[in-house]
Swiss-Prot record:
Main location per the UniProt record: membrane
Matches recorded under InterPro entries: Atg22 (IPR044738), Atg22-like (IPR024671), ATG22/LtaA_families (IPR050495), MFS_trans_sf (IPR036259)
Membrane topology, as annotated: Multi-pass membrane protein
Gene name of the encoded protein: atg22-2
Organism expressing this protein natively: Aspergillus terreus (strain NIH 2624 / FGSC A1156)
This protein's name: Autophagy-related protein 22-2
């Protein structure tokens, strides 16, 4: 009872009908963490390991050799020991030592010859495009009304079921498998944008921050009149946004602007929650990845083994979504008002129209948000480097170091374990060294730069004669994968929370959509350039030079980001957008 009274005392008054200003509860935080535990396995275990292999193998089982365009690819693969040679291609061994790994296979799609490896890449490209469309279209509904949680749960259920459906897809229906992959990856990306949009709200309503504002004698929602005075104001006059971070210039106690060297309490809390979420997701991914490796090995490493693993990944995602669905509060945003009275049949059309018009308007106005532009440009290059280094390293290990699939699986496990360690340890390091969030990100970039530089050492004649160092031996991939995972753990948590500090308050979903689109869209370019370099020189090692440049480019951009200026600009833009945010929706569109 005493805790309830304390909670009631620090709860700020609502700013619009349906506003949930209850302090963030421990159960709500557990619900937020549980979705990271549920869904992170998809991006690590499925997208990072088994989904591309499954798509390529299913297409291969239905394809023909490129050499003669008549011999089925499945005929060139040996069945595992103890199986009948009359079994279908669905039980073909994937990594038999007798299999001609260099033989290229093609499938015919709409009359075009498509390489089976390209089929997986095209599938992911389509999913990224569809994902971007969905993320933009739903951002209006996520920012307004009570749809944020509904959309999150819907995307989670559709994505997890689509992943589980691989268990029923036969190799001759590989296009259907590609469709399931598009749906699953699209829903995963959309759900994580929605999950990220909850983070500033959880921080803003956290009891420790509400208590701090109360002790300071200020409203947690900014400098607002008391509720008794606001009761007679019209809804249009109420500022419905509650900033994640205060402006930092002054407060009711006349405190001076926070020191540049100090990290705000809000950002510390946001970083802590974000880091915990990333770490919990990585722990889940490590556990399930090990389970998946055991399943594949003990089921003779067939195409069915991979489909079974994808079913397990989808089942994990599905089951652990329910705690989030039960415990995560909707936290509705201010409703959109319709000029014609708000007919329900027009509401979703209005939300979609609002989202696209808002995106265009916001994209035009972000030119005034210098620090968000600098950060997004840096993140565009950095996320491209992250995705490209991962794929390039695996391809390098397979083609030039002749590492077996089991060894490649261990590389992924080591990277994930290092990611867990990094997600939890970077906050400690930054606290001990008194680093701001931007400085921690810069430290991660510098450490990340060591990965391609180490690969370039193999060009130095003196080192080349040693026979090791510079990625000349398979064992060198393991410590390098630890460095990669350590960097990913820091970048994943700090970039997300740091970007949240620069977002205009009240527009979290829309700006996190830009964050996600920047993240996903950038990964098209790096792999293509690495492929061109590999075709030009006949080996992958020269591509490490390109990767070194790609990772280094974000560094000067990140150094230019000024968080205090960014917060002031975000507050100003939020005030400007507030005038258009209350425009009524007429005939499903915004005027």
């Amino acid at each position: 009872m005493q805790d309830d009274e304390i909670t009631e005392n620090i709860q700020p008054p609502p700013q619009y009908p349906g506003d949930d200003t209850r302090p963030t509860s421990k159960k709500e935080l557990v619900g937020w963490y549980s979705y990271g535990w549920a869904a992170e396995v998809f991006t690590v275990c499925a997208m990072g390991s088994f989904l591309p292999i499954t798509l390529e193998q299913m297409a291969r089982d239905s394809g023909v050799l490129l050499a003669d365009k008549t011999t089925p690819c499945s005929a060139t693969w040996k069945t595992p020991q103890g199986t009948s040679p009359t079994l279908s291609a669905d039980t073909t061994g994937l990594w038999s030592s007798q299999a001609p790994r260099t033989s290229q296979c093609i499938v015919h799609i709409l009359g075009a010859e498509i390489n089976t490896a390209s089929f997986a890449m095209y599938t992911f490209s389509v999913s990224v495009f569809v994902q971007a469309i969905l993320i933009i279209s739903m951002s209006g509904a996520a920012d307004h009304g009570s749809y944020r949680k509904i959309l999150l749960v819907a995307c989670a259920l559709i994505g997890s079921i689509s992943t589980m459906m691989f268990i029923a897809v036969k190799p001759n229906l590989y296009i259907l498998g590609g469709l399931f992959a598009v749906v699953a990856n699209t829903c995963f990306g959309a759900s994580f944008v929605l999950l990220n949009s909850f983070l500033p709200l959880l921080v803003r309503h956290h009891p420790s921050l509400l208590a701090k504002h109360r002790q300071a004698g200020a409203s947690p929602n900014g400098d607002r009149p008391p509720a008794t005075h606001r009761a007679h104001r019209t809804e249009d006059e109420v500022n419905v946004t509650t900033p994640l971070l205060p402006s930092g210039s002054t407060n009711t106690d006349g405190a001076t602007q926070e020191s540049v060297s100090d990290t705000s309490l809000e950002l510390k809390l946001s970083t802590k929650i974000s880091s915990n979420g990333i770490g919990i997701g990585y722990i889940a991914a490590v556990i399930l990845q090990i389970i998946c490796i055991v399943v594949v090995v003990n089921t003779n490493q067939t195409t069915f083994s991979l489909r079974l693993v994808l079913f397990l990944i989808g089942l994990w995602w599905f089951i652990f979504t329910f705690p989030a669905a039960l415990w995560l509060r909707p936290r509705p945003g201010p409703p959109l008002r319709y000029a014609d009275g708000g007919k329900e049949r027009r509401s979703w059309l209005g939300y979609i129209a609002y989202a696209w018009k808002s995106l265009g308007r916001t994209a035009m106005r972000t030119r005034h948000l210098k620090d968000i532009l600098l950060f997004l440009a840096s993140w565009f290059l950095l996320s491209d480097g992250i995705a490209t280094v991962s794929g390039t390293a695996v391809l390098f290990a397979k083609t030039q170091l002749d590492m077996e699939p089991a060894a490649l699986g261990m590389i992924n496990v080591i990277a994930m374990m290092a990611g867990v360690f990094g997600a939890f340890s970077w906050s400690y390091v930054s606290r001990v060294l008194n680093l701001r969030a931007s400085q921690t990100i810069i430290a991660c970039i510098i450490l990340f730069e060591l990965v391609p530089i180490y690969g370039l050492l193999g060009f130095i004649p003196a080192i080349k004669r040693l026979g090791f160092i510079g990625l000349q031996q398979p064992w060198e991939m393991y410590p390098l994968s630890f460095v990669y995972g350590l960097v990913m753990g820091g970048l994943s948590s700090y970039c997300r929370s740091f970007f949240g500090e620069l977002i205009p308050p009240g527009y979290e979903a829309a700006f996190y959509a830009l964050y996600a689109i920047t993240d996903k869209g950038s990964s098209i370019f790096g792999p293509a350039i690495v492929g061109a370099i590999t075709d030009r020189y006949g080996e992958i090692r020269p591509a490490f030079g390109f990767l070194a440049i790609l990772i280094l480019l974000p560094l000067p951009l990140m150094l230019l980001v000024d968080v205090d200026r960014g917060k002031r600009d975000a507050q100003a833009l939020s005030a400007e957008l507030e005038g258009t945010r209350d425009e009524p929706v007429a005939d499903g569109s915004l005027e």
